[in-house]
Regions:
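Positively charged n-region of N-terminal signal peptides that target proteins for export
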Residues: 1-5
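Bacterial N-terminal signal peptides
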Residues: 6-16
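Extracellular/lumen-exposed scaffold segments
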Residues: 18-151
């Protein structure tokens, strides 16, 4: 009975840590000049002991990380996906390209001269699959909204 409780606790902790990734984002300076561009970034923070498959994991079974950005009335360039790190895991014969720690996905937003309004709102959806060295969890989507003042 005691080992069953231990197994349950380990399972719960694994599920909690698999959902421990945070996604944030910002536009440099918090504003964009009307008729101009500004740089921004989506940031994925991955807790220790976990990794997520990169945008190009080099494995047909690994689900790649994706970032989708959208915003009404603006043009978005990017994001740019950084290179991951090749790692060898017990569950795979070949190396898999992964992200660990803090990963930045830079982008550029351009606000046209005729933009109506004083605030830009960007929607970002990050899809990733978190894994330990032994097992991968189901993929998740995290959505955030980034706002910036239009000057």
């Amino acid at each position: 009975m005691r080992s069953l409780g231990y197994l349950f606790a380990v399972l719960i902790l694994g599920i909690i840590s698999a959902h421990g990734q945070t996604v944030s984002g910002s536009i440099t300076g918090g504003s964009v000049v009307r008729g101009g561009s500004a740089k921004g970034a989506i940031v994925l923070s991955i807790p220790g002991g976990l990794h997520v498959n990169s945008s190009r994991p080099a494995s047909e079974y690994a689900i790649p990380t994706t970032v989708r950005l959208s915003g009404a009335g603006v043009r978005i360039s990017g994001p740019t996906f950084p290179r991951g790190v090749n790692r060898k895991f017990q569950f795979s014969e070949n190396t898999i390209n992964v992200y660990e720690g803090t990963v930045r996905f830079p982008f550029t937003v351009t606000v046209p001269t005729g933009f109506k309004g004083d605030t830009v709102r960007l929607r970002a959806v990050v899809r990733y699959q978190a894994c330990t060295d032994e097992v991968c969890y189901p993929p998740r989507n995290k959505e955030i909204t980034i706002t910036a003042r239009v000057r």
